[in-house]
Amino acid sequence: FYDIDTPVTLAKLDARDEEYLSPALVPAFDFYLSFTGGPTLERLRRDYGARLPWPFYCMVDPSIYRPTGEPKRWDLGYLGPHRAVRHRARGRLLTEPARHLPCRRFVVAGAQYPDSIDWPGNVELIEHVPPSAHASFYSRLRFALNLTRRNMLATGWSPSVRLFEAAACGAVILSDRWEGLDSFFPE
């Protein structure tokens, strides 16, 4: 079994929500591959009887995700759809700095951003960047902003694929803090 959203799965198991997995089924798997590592693996074993829980983190193909050599276009950028839970962090880490640094260029790329957001004039909004253009996008950033979903922040050890994409393309990453981050990107 490969669980690509272990923090959500655990919340559902704890709530006895059996939408796609029941607690009784977990011990039946030979392996439980988890998007999340760290203490979550022991919890899967202890609380739900997973026989062999192993971390199987997101990854990128380095032949696709690599620096493109394009000139830097933006000082700071974020790639991801609008989510209300990330709005405050994005405002604090991107929108507000953009307001205070009008001579710098910023970019937000993703779907579902409401028209009601008051973007500063130096923030470019791109509605969609197809996966085939992610390497180009990240390569043109001086800094890439990584914002982690709330349940993944609480669980830790849950790196998103966007984090690895940005790193593989040579972008300097500014990220919120979560347990385990330093094991993926040691000092």
Regions found by a protein language model. Name each.
Residues 118-187:
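Catalytic binding pocket for nucleotide-activated donors in carbohydrate/polymer assembly enzymes
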Residues 29, 50-53, 103-105, 122, ...:
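A generic structural signal for alpha->beta connector loops
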Residues 59-143, 153:
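Conserved catalytic-core segment of nucleotide-activated headgroup transferases in glycan assembly
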Residues 52-53, 107, 146, 174:
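A local structural micro-motif
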Residues 4, 36-42, 109-116, 177-180:
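Short, polar loop motifs at secondary-structure junctions
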Residues 8-11, 63, 116, 155, ...:
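Generic structural signal for helix capping and beta-alpha/helix-loop junctions
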Residues 1-96:
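Catalytic core of nucleotide-activated saccharide and alditol-phosphate transferases
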